[in-house]
């Protein structure tokens, strides 16, 4: 599979799967939780509160890992493993772009001062279970 095909399959996974796990580093150990993800190209975003452990963990260590793509069965589903650096983005424009009424459960609107967006810039993306016998990496 060539790099363009790998990139397209990675983007397909990102387009069709919004819930995955985000791992941060807490006291030198992985700390994972489910999150909702959005993307623009290969840059991945997820909303959170600035008052969460994950925001504090990212301030202390920006290294993160994302798993995204499994469907219900979990056998043979294409998914991606993304290792990258996260930063807290407080852009009103970005909040407007990803705001959804589904977030009202946690926030008092897109102008809630606790709402921040985690912006993840991938450093390594591996495509898994996409018809290959072994994982394939997207060159970044």
Swiss-Prot record:
Keyword Membrane annotated: no
InterPro entries (UniProt xref): Pyridox_Oxase_N, Split_barrel_FMN-bd, Stress-Dev_Protein
PANTHER family per record: PROTEIN BLI-3
Keyword Lyase attached: no
Domain of life, source organism: Bacteria
Induction remarks: By heat shock, salt stress, oxidative stress, glucose limitation and oxygen limitation.
Name this protein carries in UniProt: General stress protein 26
Transmembrane segment boundaries: none
Keywords of the record: Stress response
Organism for this UniProt entry: Bacillus subtilis (strain 168)
């Amino acid at each position: 599979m060539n790099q363009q095909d790998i990139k397209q399959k990675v983007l397909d996974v990102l387009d069709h799967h919004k819930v995955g796990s985000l791992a941060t580093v807490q006291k030198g150990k992985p700390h994972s939780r489910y999150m909702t993800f959005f993307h623009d190209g290969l840059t991945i975003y997820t909303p959170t509160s600035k008052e969460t452990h994950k925001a504090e963990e990212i301030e202390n260590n920006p290294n993160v890992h994302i798993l995204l793509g499994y469907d219900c069965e979990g056998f043979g589903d294409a998914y991606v493993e993304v290792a990258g650096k996260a930063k807290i983005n407080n852009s009103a424009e970005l909040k407007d772009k990803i705001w959804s009424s589904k977030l009202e459960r946690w926030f008092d609107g897109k102008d809630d001062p606790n709402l921040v967006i985690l912006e993840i810039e991938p450093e390594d993306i591996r495509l898994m279970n996409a018809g290959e016998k072994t994982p394939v990496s997207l060159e970044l």
